[in-house]
Amino acid sequence: MGALSKLAHSLGQPILTATCYETIHTWNPDCNGAFFDALPVGLIFSLKTYASFYLITNVVSKRGRLDKINWKKFGIDVCQSSLFLVTNMCFFLILLCKFRKWLGFFTPITMGLVSSILASGIAILVEKKSRRPALALYLINLASETYYRHLANHGYVTMHTYGECIPFGIGLMLFTWLQSIGRLPKSFNGFMNVALKSNVSENLINEKKIPDNFRLFLEKLRSDYKKTELCNHPHSCVSHSVESFAKNMTFGLTASSVLTVIRNVRTIIKNPLNLITLLVSKENLKLPLFAGFLPFIFNATRCSLNRVKYVPPVLNNVFSAGLASVAMAFYPTVSIAMYCLWKAIETVYFDLVDRGYLPKFKNGEVILYAITTGYVLWNAVVEPRAIRRGYLNFLFGLVGGKISLFNRRLYDHFGFVSRDVYTKIPEFDPKYAMINPMLYMPLVE
């Protein structure tokens, strides 16, 4: 231990000689006992999570036809994905204790970073190959957000209001650039046409299905204004922008209303009048406004620039997409923004691979998943406030709330901001401790 601790100090790594019991698994002094305490809860949680996930996926893909679902495959998928999640949790806890035992102390990186990377690398090999790229992309998304929050917690960067618009805008511009030069995969062309109404040559709204007053207004918009030679839409630029707004906002309002009702079923049952209040609330209108203004700003900008000479079409489309990203101010969502950014980067990468400019790494998704998940889980231990609240709640449920029982007062030694999410002081038997709790525990709670 002496030689290893000197090596750690020479590498700039402070050490903590506390045991894994008083540091991590304060609910049980025995490492194996602590592991078996967490296992049943994690297994049940994993089965519930993936049973719900695969059921929804199958119902949607089969359009509600339960008789068309392959229930045997459903059961296998649920068990395999649940085993993957439990494996990740188990190896994470086991390796935390093992590294403490092997070294005789903790350092910042052995407090969860190394063990979580190894655990995640082992676990992802259990999961289906078809799901690995999606999991890797999601965790890259989450890890990049966590890293930014981590830097913000220590004052290196600043959290900006509506900052979600920036990564969302970059992602949209990359997608639009690929679409403009004809290299966007077909599966994404549909998404772009739905989100931005970028390549629409037919009527967006069927005038036969709307009331007379609205039909007259729509016909006026279509006939009283003009469009440029560069525009592909069938009617005027004003009409196309307004129609794209109306159509997407209608879909957004429907989706938002359904989700609002599902989330507030109990409240509505207790008092049905609450339904009206919920549907006209500001929260319920955020998604529709975002969905509506996204194509409106894009098409209004693109049609305006089509009237300006010497503006290349590709530059026009890319700039319009970037400007349209300000629509996210109505519905600021980090998960959507980061997913759009990283999915666009992934699409550009594979385009460059296909054209021979970049190499394709075998099992690259396994490596990416291991590193990014390891970083996120490490932050769950040492600095939980850097993690997105939804994912932190997911981890909390996976381990049955035991993540809140870590003795984070000892982590102050490493300079982390650890105690502002889980403030409860853990109870443990001091006879198993190497550091006297009186040195850091408050005398009065």
Swiss-Prot record:
Top-level taxon of origin: Eukaryota
GO process terms (BP): determination of adult lifespan; positive regulation of gene expression; positive regulation of lipid storage; positive regulation of mitochondrial membrane potential; response to cold; response to food
Entry keyword set: Cytoplasmic vesicle, Membrane, Transmembrane, Transmembrane helix
Expressed in which tissues: Ubiquitously expressed.
Main location, first listed in the record: membrane
Claim: Plastid is one of the keywords in the record: no
Pfam families cross-referenced by the UniProt entry: TMEM135_C_rich
Phenotypic consequence of gene deletion: Decreased longevity, mutants living for a significantly shorter time than wild-type worms. Reduction in fat stores and reduction in mitochondrial action potential.
Topology versus the membrane: Multi-pass membrane protein
Record's subcellular location: Cytoplasmic vesicle membrane
Induction: Up-regulated following cold exposure and upon fasting.
Protein family according to the UniProt entry: Belongs to the TMEM135 family.
Known role: Involved in fat storage.
Identification of the protein by name: Transmembrane protein 135 homolog
Organism: Caenorhabditis elegans
Name of encoding gene: tmem-135
